[in-house]
Amino acid sequence: MKAVFAILFLAFIALTYAKSYDEVKEEIKNEVEREIFEDLEEESDELDNYVEESNDAKPWRRWRRAVRRIRWRKVVPYIPAIVRAAGKK
């Protein structure tokens, strides 16, 4: 009998502190809107970077950006083979 009262008491506490359906729906809506705005900001930043690259009058800056974008972790293992091949010529 004590277990039943304990379960009912915990259920009562849970229902007391539970949010209403409308509050939960509003919170989910706000979270989705926040994620959409974050995605739009990221896309806007990417577009701004692309505009900078295409309008850049200094070619060395474009070259430097291209070098920075290289995924060095994938390239590094091949560097010794490239050096050996270049040294044989």
Curated annotation (Swiss-Prot):
It is found in: Secreted; Target cell membrane. Expressed in entodermal epithelium along the body column. Residues 19-57 form a propeptide. Belongs to the arminin family. Residues 1-18 form the signal peptide. Antimicrobial peptide with a broad-spectrum antimicrobial activity. Keeps its antibacterial activity under a wide range of salt concentrations that mimic physiological conditions of human blood, which is surprising, since Hydra is an obligate freshwater animal with nearly no salt tolerance. Does not affect red blood cells. This is Arminin 375. The modification Alanine amide is found at residue 86. The keyword Membrane applies. GO terms for cellular component: extracellular region. Coiled coil: none annotated.
